[in-house]
Amino acid sequence: MARKCVVTGRQTRSGNQRSHAMNSNKRNWKANVQKVRIMVDGKPKKVYVSARALKSGKVERV
């Protein structure tokens, strides 16, 4: 399964890593997603949720 938050849609982003000489290398920044149990349509379900969504209270654990 992809590293994607089902609440906020946060996922892996790509970009350049720059050295002091400004050489560029491609790299990825991965979202901090955790597998948690939440209520989905009245039933508990395990889904991937970002840590930011958990901290801000957008979802509540079961």
From Swiss-Prot:
A GO CC term attached to the entry: ribosome
Keyword annotations: Ribonucleoprotein, Ribosomal protein
Domain of life: Bacteria
InterPro entries the UniProt entry points to: Bacterial_rp_bL28, Ribosomal_bL28, Ribosomal_bL28/bL31-like_sf, Ribosomal_bL28_bact-type, Ribosomal_bL28_sf
Location of the region described as Disordered in the Swiss-Prot/TrEMBL record: 1-27
GO molecular function terms attached to this record: structural constituent of ribosome
BP-aspect Gene Ontology terms: translation
Compositional bias (Polar residues): 9-26
PANTHER family for the chain: 50S RIBOSOMAL PROTEIN L28, LARGE RIBOSOMAL SUBUNIT PROTEIN BL28A
Similarity annotation: Belongs to the bacterial ribosomal protein bL28 family.
Protein name: Large ribosomal subunit protein bL28
